[in-house]
Regions:
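Transmembrane alpha-helical segments that form the membrane-embedded catalytic/substrate-channel core
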Residues: 13-30, 86-96
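Physicochemical signature of membrane-embedded alpha-helices that form the seven-helix bundle of GPCRs
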Residues: 10-13, 48-51, 81-84, 108, ...
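Core segments of transmembrane alpha-helices
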Residues: 53-65, 120-121
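Alpha-helical transmembrane segments
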Residues: 3-20, 75-83
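Juxtamembrane boundary at the C-terminal end of a transmembrane helix
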Residues: 124-136
Length: 136
């Protein structure tokens, strides 16, 4: 068993993205003078949800990919999963700040969450298949 250094590298970049999302929420809270909730402000609500959505998906996916990497999955597959996650998490918040009828909404928000869920399912199925095959 080895340390999941590939996953760790991507996690460092994802952590910076997460910090950027948090800073955006703080900036909007200060600008709109809203301490709790979203103050019925659509921009603040979008920023809060982009930040929360990241926190809802990234930890479990990163944990699963780290486990796959530690179990000896090929470096190329680890890079593929983590690069897809990074792309998805870059796209999703961009789509949160545009109108729902725009092409940016469909490509960024819808595409970002679709790619996120695809990586989530792929990582889960890879773990299950490795367990079924007796690979630990």
């Amino acid at each position: 068993m080895h340390l999941p250094s590939i996953t760790a590298g991507y996690l460092a970049v994802l952590a910076l993205l997460y910090a950027g999302l948090a800073i955006q929420v703080l900036r909007l809270r200060r600008g709109y003078r809203v301490l709790f909730g979203d103050g019925d402000n659509i921009k603040l609500r979008s920023a809060i949800r982009a930040h929360a959505n990241f926190a809802e998906y990234v930890p479990i996916i990163a944990l699963m990919v780290a486990m796959l990497e530690m179990s000896g999955m090929s470096a190329m597959r680890v890079h593929l999963l983590m690069a897809a996650l990074l792309l998805a998490r870059l796209l999703h918040p961009l789509g949160m700040y545009v109108g729902p009828r725009s092409w940016q909404f469909h490509i960024c928000r819808v595409g970002g969450i679709a790619l996120t869920v695809t990586v989530l399912i792929a990582a889960a199925l890879l773990i299950l298949s490795r367990l079924a095959a007796g690979i630990s």
